[in-house]
Curated annotation (Swiss-Prot):
It comes from Mycobacterium tuberculosis (strain ATCC 25618 / H37Rv). This is Vitamin B12-dependent ribonucleoside-diphosphate reductase. Provides the precursors necessary for DNA synthesis. Catalyzes the biosynthesis of deoxyribonucleotides from the corresponding ribonucleotides. Belongs to the ribonucleoside diphosphate reductase class-2 family. GO terms for biological process: deoxyribonucleotide biosynthetic process; DNA biosynthetic process. Keywords: ATP-binding, Cobalamin, Cobalt, Deoxyribonucleotide synthesis, Disulfide bond, DNA synthesis, Nucleotide-binding, Oxidoreductase. 5'-deoxyadenosylcobalamine (coenzyme B12). It catalyses: a 2'-deoxyribonucleoside 5'-diphosphate + [thioredoxin]-disulfide + H2O = a ribonucleoside 5'-diphosphate + [thioredoxin]-dithiol. Substrate binds at residues 191, 206-207, 235, 389-393, 534-538. SUPFAM superfamilies: PFL-like glycyl radical enzymes, R1 subunit of ribonucleotide reductase, N-terminal domain. The gene is nrdZ. It holds the Pfam family ATP-cone. Its EC number is 1.17.4.1. It is an enzyme of class 1 (oxidoreductase). The keyword Disulfide bond applies.
Length: 706
């Protein structure tokens, strides 16, 4: 074998350089020939079989390039030539791995072809499946009418059209810059911006908060507005706190009120009906103030029946006064919102225990820290914030909207280090993109457009934190990870502020600037610039981990196009192949376990760098959320995962710690506490961890579509 390799290397040195100028891809497009791509493919195959000859990949790549000759080389011919040259060199093990890789890629292309999708972005099959069902435009026969790259181009062009309002003729230049970010998956906006750009719907904002006042007219008018928004793919959040309690007098009829929980059920049913004909499952948030007389019914609304309110996340709006009363075992007042009168007093600790027991049982309700939120309200003169969007990352005033986007941190690496310059550049362009979204989006009701333009709130966040940490070999549950996450979010927020100030110089400050807490500082284009969403489907499209969440499993099966396909975390897959310990049997065993911690067959540093959400202590979940929140103007959507053995006291401790850590909201999820959870490790016999088509690795318990 060594003699064959030496003769092969010597033979290749004598061949003259006459390489192809172009490569014809399978879709017929031409791209420049790049010998480095051949060398990289051979290097990956060599690493998997522990072939450590550093010169071999370059030698093989040169031999392939020489053999192809001048002109245009079809990609299949290039790959055939790689196989042949590996065989001639006696590198049978490397050739076998390369052949298997080709076969798997061919199977993936076949599956995508069956879906009728052209995918020049080389996305995962799960991503392509979701895009086909809900994002891509279709022709009259229901077939996809655009490719994955054309979807990104459509969104970029639509959003960049806003640029011509400020600098005529500049939209084409900015469309190209926006498209580069989207095609490279360095940044993606919330789903409606991808779905609805350039369509008749035209609604690009992700979520809205709608007001509900204490009258049937308001209740049903808001319900109608919510249906219209949900039909277009928008999520809705509500404060039910202004509705009179159950049993209260209704003067106009002489009857009694049914209370906020009854109308909450009505809203949930409507969301289910609307979503059946829409592009996304309805997702809503209901917040009820802790002082409302019906708070106990609200707290137990989902705990008593897991199938209740499937389209709603529930959060109790708690105040500092209530939580201080809990700490000192004081009394808590319940106040009728119609009259403003105290109707009852109860031990604060008793109510808090009921909240914690319900969350322990099924994940709801979470907490929204109203005083913490309103201390950071950028425009307090416009009102007190009482509700959030469905996932809790954006507290909003009535009729305000979320215009969200996330930087893919996994794409912010270069040569094994964070590319800080690129991170700041992407953040600056992303702020401009999101500001443009406000201008080009259509708003079904005038109040929505007026509220969006008055404060021009945007929410630039992140996804892929867990993948970035794993790629750097940093355990998620470590001081180093918390420090890096803090530094990342600080740099993003600083870059976002700089970009917003520059936009204010070009376009003017947001109209409500003089009434804002920034009035004495320099002008800003946006009242709010940062927010960390769970990212839902967009992290699936980007092929990375959700928001700032840990990985939910290292290997799992996903139901796609009628089959269950084994998926492996891409970062773990690369590491395992690079270090030569990748084996199909190993991956199948990991899939049965879900995670790799405590798995003795892997190196200790690998086990440490790839924790799953269920393997991380709750305190580390909260520490990460709190660290990121310190450099986020809106809020951070994050689930604190608890083991199945967690107690109600554990939930209580996390909720109190979250308040003291000054996060703006908190959600817990105890493993196994909800029927039909997406991810399952425990079974009477080994069972592969499973995910449905659209699960992206975020919260296993609460609803998130955004």
């Amino acid at each position: 074998m060594p003699g064959e390799r030496r003769r092969f290397a010597q033979a290749t040195k004598s061949v003259g350089v006459s390489w192809p100028a172009k490569v014809r891809r399978r879709d017929g497009t031409l791209v420049p020939f790049d010998i480095a791509r051949i060398e990289a493919a051979v290097t990956r195959a060599a690493r998997e079989v522990a072939c450590d000859d550093p010169d071999m990949p370059g030698t093989v790549a040169k031999a392939v390039a020489d053999a192809l000759g001048r002109g245009i080389a079809p990609v299949e011919d290039i790959q055939d030539c790689v196989e042949a040259r590996l065989g001639e060199a006696g590198l049978d093990d490397v050739a076998r791995v390369y052949i298997i890789y080709r076969q798997r890629r061919a199977e993936l292309r076949t599956a995508k072809a069956l879906l009728g999708v052209r995918d020049e972005l080389k996305l995962s099959l799960a991503a392509v499946t979701v895009l086909r069902e809900r994002y891509l435009l279709h022709d009259e026969q229901g077939r996809p009418a655009e490719s994955t790259g054309e979807l990104m181009d459509r969104s970029a062009r639509c959003v960049a059209a806003a640029e011509d309002q400020y600098e005529p003729g500049s939209s084409r230049r900015w469309a190209e810059r926006f498209a580069t970010l989207l095609r490279n998956l360095e940044f993606l906006p919330n789903s409606p911006t991808l779905m609805n750009s350039g369509t008749d719907l035209g609604l690009l904002a992700g979520c809205f908060v709608l007001p509900i006042e204490d009258s049937l007219q308001s209740i049903f008018a808001t319900l109608g507005q919510a249906a219209e928004l949900q039909r277009a793919g928008g999520g809705t959040g509500y404060a039910f706190s202004h509705l009179r309690p159950a049993g209260d007098r209704v003067a106009s009829t002489g009857g009694t009120a049914s209370g906020p929980v009854s109308f909450l059920r009505l809203y949930d049913s409507a969301a289910g009906v609307v979503s059946m004909g829409g592009r996304r499952r309805g997702a809503c948030m209901a917040v009820l103030d802790v002082s409302h007389p019906d708070i106990c019914d609200f707290v137990t609304a989902k705990a008593e029946s897991p199938s209740e309110l499937p389209h709603f996340n529930l959060s109790v709006g708690v105040t500092d006064a209530f939580l201080r009363a809990v700490e000192r075992n004081g009394l808590h007042r319940l106040v009728n919102p119609r009259t403003g009168k105290i109707v009852a007093r109860m031990p604060a600790a008793e109510l808090f225990d009921a909240i914690c027991k319900a969350a322990h049982a099924g994940g709801d309700p979470g907490l929204v820290f109203l005083d913490t939120i309103n201390r950071a309200n950028p425009v307090p003169g416009r009102g007190r914030i009482e509700a959030t969007n469905p996932c809790g990352e954006v507290p909003l005033l009535p009729y305000e909207s979320c215009n969200l986007g996330s930087i893919n941190l996994a794409r912010m690496l270069a040569d094994g280090r964070v590319d800080w310059d690129r991170l700041e550049e992407v953040a600056g362009v992303a702020v401009r993109f999101l500001d443009d979204v406000i201008d080009v989006s259509r708003y079904p009701f005038p109040e929505l457009g007026e509220a969006a333009r008055a404060t021009r709130k945007i929410g630039l966040g992140v996804m892929g934190l867990a993948e970035l940490l794993a790629a750097l070999g940093i355990p998620y549950d470590s001081e180093e990870a918390v420090r890096l996450a803090t530094r990342l979010m600080r740099r993003i927020q600083q870059a976002a502020h700089t970009a917003s100030r520059r936009l204010a110089e070009e376009r003017g400050a947001f109209p409500a600037f003089t009434d804002s807490r920034f009035a004495r500082s320099g002008p800003r284009r946006n009242a709010q610039v940062t927010s960390v969403a769970p990212t839902g489907t967009i992290s699936l499209i980007a092929g990375t981990t959700a928001g700032i969440e840990p990985m939910f499993a290292i290997a799992f099966t996903r139901a796609i196009v009628g089959r269950h396909l084994l998926e492996v975390n891409p970062c773990f897959d690369r590491l395992a192949r690079d270090r030569g310990f990748y084996r199909d049997e190993l991956i199948a065993e990991i899939a049965q376990r879900g995670g790799v911690r405590g798995y003795p067959r892997l190196p200790a540093e690998v086990r440490a760098a790839f924790p799953t959400a269920a393997e991380i202590a709750p305190q580390w979940h909260l520490r990460m959320q709190a660290a990121v929140q310190r450099h986020v103007e809106a809020a951070v959507s994050k689930t604190v995962n608890l083991p199945a053995t967690a107690t109600v006291d554990d939930v209580r401790a996390i909720y109190v710690a979250a308040w003291k850590a000054k996060v703006k909201g908190i959600t817990v999820y105890r493993y196994g506490s909800r029927e039909g959870q997406v991810l399952s490790y425990a079974a009477p016999k080994p069972l592969l961890a499973q995910a449905d088509t659209e699960f992206s690795g975020g919260c296993a318990g609460r609803s998130c579509e955004f």
